[in-house]
Amino acid sequence: MEPSELASKKAYRGLPMEGMLASWYAKNTAKLAADFKACARRIAAQLAPGACVLEVAPGPGYLAIELAKLGRYRITGVDISRSFVRMATEHAARAAIDAEFRQGDAAALPLADETFDFIVCRAAFKNFSSPMTALNEMHRVLRPGGKALIIDMRNDASDETIDSTVEDMRLGPVDAFLTRAIFKHMLRRRAYSRDDFARMAAASPFARADIEEAAMGFDVWLRKSSATT
């Protein structure tokens, strides 16, 4: 599938993550604390002291907060959900973390050019209505030589892999049933293949892309050229 087809295919956002739905999501993902800590450590290994980091679609802010605990980084999060921006701000204040969360669209980031050293987008890219525009925006706000990391579900994740993933979340029976259904009948349908990510990366301004595979998803590493734009 060509990048132009991918852009038209994704002409929706799915359910708006506001109010009670956002609260339900935050409650369940809070149980993934170990995953957020591990992801934060992987990212911190890529960062110099004082690095400026952007999380696109941080949701309740759990990953950004764990990353902020690991070093003197300048952390910013942009999410389209006002509920998530409020939650993330409250969670950061409770953790005594200096991080800024603001409302905005991944396809029109309310940020200046060449501001960040590193960008991460976890479990959200498949929901963007304009994925190629979002990639271009990530490139725009990265400094020369900066990196971006997209972590997301793969569209061929098996039912067994999904079941195992949900089991590891240790949810209650109702929440586990709903989460399995959402993964299998909503999120997997929106997710991309390895080839999809490779084509989008090739069509983007990024100088280099490396894709790492796991049973449930992909880590897509993108690098901006070190040449001044």
Which residues fall in each region the model found?
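Conserved class I S-adenosyl-L-methionine
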Residues: M1-A48, E66
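C-terminal alpha-helical "lid/dimerization" subdomain adjacent to the S-adenosyl-L-methionine
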Residues: L32, I151-S204, D210-E212, G217-V220
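Short glycine-centered segments of the SAM/dcSAM-binding site in methyltransferase folds
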Residues: C52, G146-K147
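Class I SAM-dependent methyltransferase SAM/SAH-binding core
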Residues: L54, P60-A108
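A conserved beta-strand element that flanks and buttresses the S-adenosyl-L-methionine
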Residues: V120
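A short His-aromatic
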Residues: K126-N127
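A short glycine-rich, Lys/Arg-flanked "PGG" loop and its adjoining helix->strand segment in the class I
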Residues: M132-P144
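C-terminal lobe and adjacent flexible extensions of AdoMet/dcAdoMet transferase-like proteins
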Residues: D219-T229
